[in-house]
Amino acid sequence: MDLMYLNYNCFQRGFDDPRQIRIRMEALACQEIFLRAERNEIQLVWSFMHEDENIFCPFSERKLEVLRLATLCEVKVGPKEVIYDLAKSFQEKGRFSAKDAIHLACADHTKARLFITCDNKLIKKVRSSKIEVTTLNPVDYIRQEAMK
């Protein structure tokens, strides 16, 4: 069973402007990922960084939905020195923001097979920095799974 780490934007994608086709497709792909987690076909990770981002979300409806989705995450990861050290090394490798570096470090630390994000710039940064966390857009993940 795949262990996946979803960037926080995947938890919120369903609230973004559905008039843009890319956003609508990503929202559907994220919804499918959460349905697969519900059916125990995949495992998801919830980290202290997700929790932190959700605390600072100014929209109560979004916060509540993210907390509901968080219940689907079977693997939980709290703050650890090893994660912070790994995040610092990722920042040096790829000039990642602290937040992105911590999400990537959490994915790496939990041995998640995939890091899923709606942020194409982040995907390109991860790939060019040679960080060994397979990073995909949710639509690309669903497309790959359909080809199996």
Question: What is the predicted role of each segment?
Answer:
Residues 5-58, 139-143:
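PIN/NYN-family metal-dependent endoribonuclease catalytic core
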Residues 1-3:
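Non-catalytic pre-domain segments flanking phosphatase-related domains
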Residues 11-12, 17-27, 93, 104, ...:
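Acidic, PIN/NYN-like endoribonuclease modules and their adjacent C-terminal/linker elements
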Residues 30-35, 63-67, 104:
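Short amphipathic alpha-helical segments and helix-helix/interface helices
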Residues 56-71:
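Short, electropositive alpha-helical surface patch
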